Amino acid sequence: MKLNVNLPHHPYDIVIENGALSQVGSWLSQLWQPQKLVVITDNRVARLYAEKVKLSLEAAGFKVFTFDFLEGEASKNLTTVNKAYEFLAKVGLTRSDGIVALGGGVVGDLAGFVASTYMRGIHFVQIPTSLTAQVDSSIGGKTGVNTPWAKNMVGTFTQPDGVLIDPEVLHTLGQRELIEGMGEVVKYGLIEDKELWDELSEMDGSPESILEHAESIIYHSCDVKRKIVIEDELDNGVRLYLNFGHTIGHAIEATAGYGQVMHGEAVAIGMVQVSRVAEKQGLMPAGITEDIIHMCQKFGLPVDYQPWNENALYQALTHDKKARGNSIKLVLVPELGSANIHQIPLEEMKEFLKK
C-alpha cells in the first residue's frame, strides 16, 4: 500500500508493506543515487535490524555507516545530537549524502533533527519500527529533541524523502511498547476517522488483535495524518487537531521524567483528563469521556497517572508550543470523528488539571 504526502515543495510517499525491511536497498535506490549513508538508530533496534538494513543498502551500491545511541526518551537531547554531528563529520558525510532514521519515535525525531541541521540540511528517510512512529511521528516532518524544560522544545519542520513502514517488525516489540502506540491510533479515530474508530471497537484489544489489524490501522492513521499535513504543514491550523491529548500528555512526560511514562500512554491520560473537564463544561458531548476510557482500557492503555501534581504540570504547560502569549490552544472533540480548537487563557488550564 502506498500513500502520497503531496506537499507542493516536497512530495513524498509512505510505503506500507509487510516484509518491506528486506527490500530497503531497492526502495532507497529509487529515491537516491548510490552514495554514502549513515543509519541512525538506537542500540536495541541496531541489534535487531541494523545488519539486515546495512546489507540490503550495500547490495544496492550504498556505502553505509551506523551510528547508534542508548535507547529511550532520555537520550533524545542535544548531547546525543552533538555526538551524532561528530560521527557524521568523522565519516565525511556531505550534503550529497543521506541519513536513514531506523527506529521508533525517539530515533526518528532525533535523526530528522540531525539531518535538518547538519551542514544546514541533508536528505533523510524514515524507517519507523514502533507502532507510535509508524502511525504518527515518522510522517509530517516534525523533528526535535527534548530539553529539561519541555518535550520537543528544540526542533524543525523538515520533510523526509520517503517513509518505509514494515508492519511485521511490530512482532519484535515488547507488549508495553506495542500497546502505547494505540494511544495515537485511538486519537485518530476520535478526531477524524469514524471508520477507524469502528474497527477499533470491533477488536478485542489484545496484543494479538493489534498485530492482526496492524496493516489496516497503520494505513488509516497515516491517511489521516498525511491529509492534515498537506492542508497545514507548519502547524498553524488544522494540524493542531493532532495534538488532542498532547497538551497535558507532554506535561506528564516532562514532569514524570522522560521515559517513565511512554508517549502513547501520556496521550491516553491526556485525552481522558481534558475530555472529563471539557464534558463537565459542556464543551464536549455527554458520555464521550466514558467512551474514551473504555477504548483506552480495552487496549491496556492507562487512563490516570499518580502522583498527579497540578502545580508541576501547569509549569510544564507554560512551555507548550501551542501557547501564545498568555493563552493556549486546546484541542477538543465536539463529536466523534471531528475536532476543534478552543483557545483559552493559560491560567484556565489549571481547571483542566483538576481531578
UniProtKB/Swiss-Prot annotation:
Coiled coil: none
GO molecular function: 3-dehydroquinate synthase activity; metal ion binding; nucleotide binding
Cofactor binding note from Swiss-Prot or TrEMBL: Binds 1 divalent metal cation per subunit. Can use either Co(2+) or Zn(2+).
Residues that, per the record, bind Zn(2+): 184, 246, 263
Cofactor(s) needed: Co(2+); Zn(2+); NAD(+)
Keyword Transmembrane helix: no
InterPro entries per UniProt: Dehydroquinate_synthase (IPR050071), DHQ_synth_AroB (IPR016037), DHQ_synth_fam (IPR030963), DHQS/DOIS_N (IPR030960), DHQS_C (IPR056179)
Enzyme class, first EC level, given as a word: lyase
Positions bound to NAD(+): 71-76, 105-109, 129-130, 142, 151
Catalytic activity: 7-phospho-2-dehydro-3-deoxy-D-arabino-heptonate = 3-dehydroquinate + phosphate
One of the record's GO cellular component terms: cytoplasm
Enzyme Commission number(s) of this protein: 4.2.3.4
Subcellular location field: Cytoplasm
CDD domains the record matches: DHQS
Pathway assigned to this chain's UniProt record: Metabolic intermediate biosynthesis; chorismate biosynthesis; chorismate from D-erythrose 4-phosphate and phosphoenolpyruvate: step 2/7
Keyword Amino-acid biosynthesis: yes
Gene3D superfamilies: 3.40.50.1970, Dehydroquinate synthase-like - alpha domain
GO BP terms, alphabetized: amino acid biosynthetic process; aromatic amino acid family biosynthetic process; chorismate biosynthetic process
UniProt entry keywords in alphabetical sequence: Amino-acid biosynthesis, Aromatic amino acid biosynthesis, Cobalt, Cytoplasm, Lyase, Metal-binding, NAD, Nucleotide-binding, Zinc
Function: Catalyzes the conversion of 3-deoxy-D-arabino-heptulosonate 7-phosphate (DAHP) to dehydroquinate (DHQ).
Alphabetized HAMAP family for the sequence: DHQ_synthase
Protein family: Belongs to the sugar phosphate cyclases superfamily. Dehydroquinate synthase family.
Protein name: 3-dehydroquinate synthase
Source organism phylogeny: Bacteria, Bacillati, Bacillota, Bacilli, Lactobacillales
Gene: aroB
